[in-house]
Each structure stands twice: as C-alpha cells, then as structure tokens.
C-alpha cells in the first residue's frame, strides 16, 4: 500500500486545484456507499488500484499476502492511496462516503482479476 501526497496544490480565491496523480490508469470508477457498509474483501493478482476519497470517512484493512503485513487505516476527504497486487483490501464506511477508484488495467468480465477472500468468523 502506498499513501500518496498531491503532486501539485494551487489554492486561490476561486477555490483550488489539486494534482492527484500523473500516472496512466485504464479504468475509472465512482463509488458511493452508505455509512456502516462493507466493500471489498478481495485482492487482485495483477491490478493496482488508486483510491481518492471525495467525501466521508472509510476504514481500510489491508492484509498483504506476500509479506504478511496487516494495516488498519482511516481515510478522509482528500486522501489518496494505492493498493498493490496481492493486498487483500476491505473497506468499512464510517460515514456516508464517495470515492474515485482507478485501475491499472480494465476489468475483463470474462477473466476478471478479482479474487474474493472468505470472511473471517
């Protein structure tokens, strides 16, 4: 997992401009989720994902299948992070939340790079 800082920030009297990423992404998605809901609990073998939180608070749990590292983080409006392949990621919305999700490769419905993990009891 990588937590990103903006590459450019230009506030002025009109509002502001925030540079999120200069990387190329193959797919861009908008996600809206009500408070206290869970999404994810899966990983990808090849796909990297960038997340940009537009509004709300989201608890993110990462379990790296390669290193065994376990992270629990809270993200808020304006936060940007990348999830790498083989990182199981689970999201729980603390509040209603909206975010942008970008994938390094477009999801192929015939052969999705999407691997669900069994829920823990």
Regions flagged by a language model, labelled:
Residues 46-63:
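Glycine- and acidic-residue-biased ligand/ion/polar-headgroup-sensing regions
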Residues 10-41:
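A short glycine-rich, His/Asp/Glu-containing loop-to-beta-strand
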Residues 65-85:
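Short acidic-glycine-tyrosine-enriched beta hairpin
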Residues 76-82, 91, 97, 121:
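Structured catalytic cores of enzymes that bind and process phosphorylated ligands/cofactors
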């Amino acid at each position: 997992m990588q937590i990103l800082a903006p590459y450019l920030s230009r506030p002025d009297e009109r509002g502001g401009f925030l540079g999120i990423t200069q990387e190329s992404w193959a797919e861009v998605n908008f996600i809206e989720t009500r408070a206290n809901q869970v999404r994810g609990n899966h990983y990808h073998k090849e796909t990297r994902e960038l997340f940009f939180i537009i509004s709300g608070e989201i608890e993110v749990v990462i379990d790296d299948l390669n290193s065994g590292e376990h992270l629990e983080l809270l993200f808020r409006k304006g936060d940007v992070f990348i999830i790498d392949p083989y990182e199981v990621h689970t999201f729980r919305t603390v509040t209603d939340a909206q975010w942008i999700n970008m994938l390094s490769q477009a999801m192929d419905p015939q052969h999705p790079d999407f691997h669900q993990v069994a829920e823990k009891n």
